[in-house]
C-alpha cells in the first residue's frame, strides 16, 4: 500500500455518485455516499407513509447506536452525546445551558473562528487570547502558565481551523487543562473524522457534513457527566430515565439526517480511522507540494502539517472570491474563498482553501495547479 492509501481512495470513490467536476472543498461540505443518500431518502419516505413520530420511534435503536459510535470517536459514552443541528448550534446549546456569570473569561486562540467569538460575547463571556507560536499553534507551556496565573471559566480550543490547516496540540492542551482543573471545550467541526479527537476534553462538538461525509443539518455535542451536571436545559425532560444530555436534543431535529450520519460514521470506522487520517494527511502534503508557487499563490501551512486543509495566499492584486468563481465556471473545480471574518484576530486578508477528501486524486490536484498557473 502506498503512503497515499490509494486503495482506500478508490473504495471511498466507488461508494459515491460520480463527480460532475473536481470537488476539493470537503472542509465546507463533503460528498455523501450513495448508501447514506438512500438511507436519508428512505426515512423521509417512511415518514410520509407511516407518520413522522411512528418512524422516529422505530429508528431510535439506530439513532442510539449513532450516539454510541460518535461518543466512541470523542472518548465518551452514548449517554454523554446529544444530536443537534450543527456545530454552531452545539456551541449555542452548550453556552445556553452552562449559564456562566457575565464577564467570565474564556481562553481561546487568537485565530479563533469568528462566529465562535460572536457566540461567546453574546453569552456575556470575555475571550482571552491563549499564547501561540508564529504558526498560530497553541504553546502548551505558556498556556499552563496562563491557567495558573488567571484561570478562565473554561478553555475553548478549535482543534483545526476553518481558515488554516494547522492542527493544534489538543492532547497537550487537554493535559494542561486537566492538571489545572479548568474545563476544556473542543471545537471539532473540522477535526471530527479528520484527526483524533479522543483527547479527554470535557466537551466536544462537531458536524456531520464535513469530514464524516454525512448529511447537512446534523451536529453533535458530547459533554462528560461532571460538566453535564452543571448544565440546565431550556426544556427539561419529563422522562427521568433518559440521560441528562438528551434534554438538549430538539424534537424538531433532522431525524433522517441523523440516520444518514450514523451510516456515514459506520463507513468511516469501516475504512479505519488511522488509515483515513494517514491518507488525508498525505493528500494535504501532496496539495501543498503541487500548489505552492503556482501562479504566484503561496501555501500558508507547513508542508508536513497532518491535515488535508491547505490555504493559499493570493498574489498581489488577485481577487480570491473571483478566482473561486472562475475555477468553478471554467474548470469545474470547487474550493472555498475564506475571508478574514473567519479568524478576525489572525487573518489580514482572504485565502483560497483547498480541502480534498479520501476520494480526491493527484490528477485533480494537478488540474487545480494548472488552473491557478494560467
Set out the residue ranges of the language-model regions.
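Pyridoxal 5′-phosphate
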Residues: 1-374
Amino acid at each position: 500500500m502506498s503512503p497515499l492509501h490509494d486503495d482506500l481512495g478508490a473504495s471511498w470513490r466507488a461508494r459515491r455518485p460520480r463527480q460532475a467536476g473536481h470537488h476539493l472543498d470537503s472542509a465546507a461540505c463533503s460528498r455523501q455516499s450513495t448508501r447514506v443518500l438512500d438511507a436519508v431518502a428512505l426515512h423521509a419516505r417512511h415518514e410520509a407513509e407511516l407518520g413522522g413520530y411512528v418512524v422516529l420511534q422505530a429508528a431510535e435503536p439506530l439513532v442510539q447506536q449513532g450516539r454510541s459510535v460518535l461518543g466512541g470517536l470523542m472518548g465518551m459514552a452514548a449517554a454523554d452525546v446529544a444530536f443537534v443541528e450543527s456545530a454552531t448550534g452545539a456551541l449555542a446549546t452548550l453556552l445556553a445551558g452552562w449559564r456562566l456569570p457575565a464577564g467570565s473569561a474564556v481562553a481561546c486562540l487568537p485565530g479563533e473562528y469568528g462566529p465562535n467569538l460572536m457566540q461567546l460575547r453574546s453569552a456575556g463571556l470575555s475571550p482571552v487570547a491563549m499564547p501561540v507560536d508564529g504558526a498560530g499553534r497553541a504553546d502548551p507551556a505558556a498556556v499552563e502558565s496562563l491557567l495558573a496565573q488567571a484561570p478562565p471559566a473554561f478553555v475553548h480550543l478549535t482543534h483545526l481551523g476553518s481558515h488554516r490547516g494547522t492542527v493544534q496540540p489538543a492532547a497537550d492542551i487537554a493535559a494542561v487543562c486537566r492538571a489545572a482543573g479548568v474545563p476544556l471545550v473542543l471545537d471539532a467541526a473540522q477535526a471530527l473524522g479528520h484527526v483524533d479527537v479522543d483527547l479527554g476534553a470535557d466537551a466536544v462538538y462537531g458536524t456531520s457534513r464535513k469530514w464524516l461525509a454525512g448529511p447537512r443539518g446534523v451536529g453533535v455535542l458530547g459533554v462528560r457527566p461532571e460538566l453535564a451536571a452543571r448544565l440546565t436545559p431550556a426544556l427539561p425532560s419529563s422522562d427521568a430515565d433518559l440521560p441528562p444530555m438528551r434534554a438538549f436534543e430538539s424534537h424538531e431535529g433532522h431525524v433522517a439526517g441523523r440516520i444518514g450520519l450514523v451510516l456515514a460514521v459506520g463507513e468511516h470506522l469501516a475504512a479505519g480511522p488511522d488509515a483515513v487520517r494517514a491518507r488525508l494527511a498525505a493528500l494535504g502534503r501532496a496539495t501543498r507540494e503541487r500548489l505552492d508557487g503556482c501562479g504566484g499563490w503561496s501555501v500558508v501551512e507547513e508542508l508536513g502539517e497532518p491535515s488535508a486543509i491547505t490555504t493559499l495566499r493570493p498574489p498581489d492584486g488577485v481577487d480570491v472570491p473571483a478566482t473561486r468563481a472562475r475555477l468553478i465556471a471554467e474548470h469545474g473545480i470547487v474550493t472555498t474563498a475564506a475571508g478574514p471574518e473567519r479568524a478576525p484576530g489572525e487573518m489580514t486578508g482572504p485565502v483560497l482553501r483547498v480541502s480534498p477528501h479520501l476520494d480526491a486524486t493527484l490528477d485533480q490536484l494537478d488540474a487545480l495547479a494548472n488552473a491557478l498557473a494560467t
